[in-house]
Design a protein with these regions (language model features):
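Conserved alpha-helical substructure of the radical SAM core
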Residues: 109-211, 216-219
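Conserved AdoMet/S-adenosylmethionine-binding subsite of the radical SAM
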Residues: 186-302, 306-311, 316
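N-terminal pre-core extensions flanking Radical SAM catalytic domains
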Residues: 97-150, 327, 331-375
Length: 375
């Protein structure tokens, strides 16, 4: 396993304040964790001129030009997704800064700094798949659902076992989401949402599940979501698939129950190649791919913790065999041994054998395809 921890310079261990780069969703999700450890935010840098001059949680938002003479020796944590991080990283390096010495990504900060400075085992983003059934058959599905040899719903007991195993071994998960297939197809959805909300809500920043909007959840599920502040992320494929009426009905229901939600339409997808045309890479090409991709989402399935949730799905589909180093059997980790539990965090920043054949989500994958194209 290629470990990507232990990259931050020694000075990071002594800090009690940071500068955030980005006043968006990621900062909002992380704010409770920052409060837990009493780390101070000096100010927030943001390129969006409409945010500059305003505040985030009472903290000033300023431009980089206004910030550069105030940074001094303070460390910057970039609060964005991977693609935007690369762009900001280049910008800061062009201005004389050094990655891991002067700044780092939020995922790196969560996994490395919280362990070194606070002794906490924290994860950034974990997905748990609750069903491999779906209402659509997307040719380029990034979970490979149409290519499964056998599809099924996970039972409540299986899902409960997963979350109990993981949450008893880590202190905090910034973003925890339930996926499919189409999660609404699983009759256990309401029960597992309520169980996680009741038992572990204080241990995760954002609790969410992801749907395609083709099925409207029951009122009972909406009430559970409202009670536990559960976020719904809706993937909009209506430009390719005719179901806009269902999407609009779902939107109306979400507004009626005042549910936190995002309805997202992607204009383009990148084809992973697998399983119909898996990528072939030599060692040098693989290293470049890992530099470009480096997904933030880990997987929690079948009582195991996976570096990449997509790699789990590749194996579950019946078309790939993972190496033993690609996952951790959680039952084998002593929940009372914090050093042993830290192996989970180490794997979260690692790699896996599936990377050799997966096109991935990085800038090196330019094999673009239409969104939601059906088989």
């Amino acid at each position: 396993m290629n470990k990507n921890l232990e990259r931050l310079s020694e000075e990071w261990k002594e800090i009690d304040s940071i500068i955030l780069y980005g006043a968006g969703i990621v900062s909002k999700i992380c704010q409770n964790l920052f409060k837990k450890v009493d780390i101070k935010i000096s100010f927030v840098i943001d390129r969006d001129e409409t945010k500059q001059g305003k505040t985030w949680n009472g903290i000033p938002i300023i431009s980089y030009e206004d910030a550069k003479n105030k940074i001094n020796d303070q460390k910057i944590v970039i609060m964005t997704a991977h693609t935007a991080y690369n762009e900001i990283s280049r910008f800061l390096c062009d201005h004389g800064m050094e990655e891991y010495k002067d700044f780092c990504a939020i995922g790196q900060f969560i996994c490395e700094w919280f362990w070194n400075a606070k002794g906490m085992n924290c994860l950034y983003h974990v997905d748990m798949t609750i069903t491999t059934r779906c209402t659509f058959r997307c040719k380029n599905c990034n979970m490979f659902i149409p290519y499964y040899k056998e599809q099924r719903d996970c039972t409540f007991e299986e899902l409960k076992n997963n979350v109990d195993l993981l949450f008893s071994r880590v202190d905090y998960i910034v973003y925890f989401a339930l996926l499919g297939g189409e999660p609404t197809l699983n009759p256990a959805l309401g029960d597992i949402l309520e169980y996680i909300g009741e038992t572990y809500r204080e241990k995760c920043g954002r609790l969410a599940y992801v749907v395609n909007g083709s099925i409207i959840p029951s009122d009972e599920i909406f009430m559970i979501m409202k009670k536990y502040d559960i976020h719904l992320l809706v993937s909009d494929y209506s430009k390719e698939i005719s179901y806009i009426e269902k999407l609009n009905a779902l939107r109306k229901k979400l507004e009626e129950f005042d549910i936190l939600h995002d309805i997202r339409y992607s204009q383009i997808w990148a084809d992973f190649g697998f399983p119909t045309a898996p990528v072939q890479r030599n060692a040098e090409q693989l290293q470049e791919h890992l530099r470009c991709c480096h997904p933030e989402w880990n997987g929690l399935n079948d009582g195991k913790f996976y570096y990449c949730n997509i790699s789990w799905s590749a194996e579950k589909s019946g078309h790939f065999k993972l190496d033993k180093e690609d996952y951790i059997i959680l039952q084998d980790v002593d929940a009372n041994d914090r050093e042993a539990c830290h192996r989970i965090v180490e794997l979260s920043r690692g790699t896996c054998s599936f990377c050799k054949v997966c096109g991935g989500c990085g800038s090196d994958n330019t094999n673009y395809v239409p969104v939601g194209r059906q088989l």
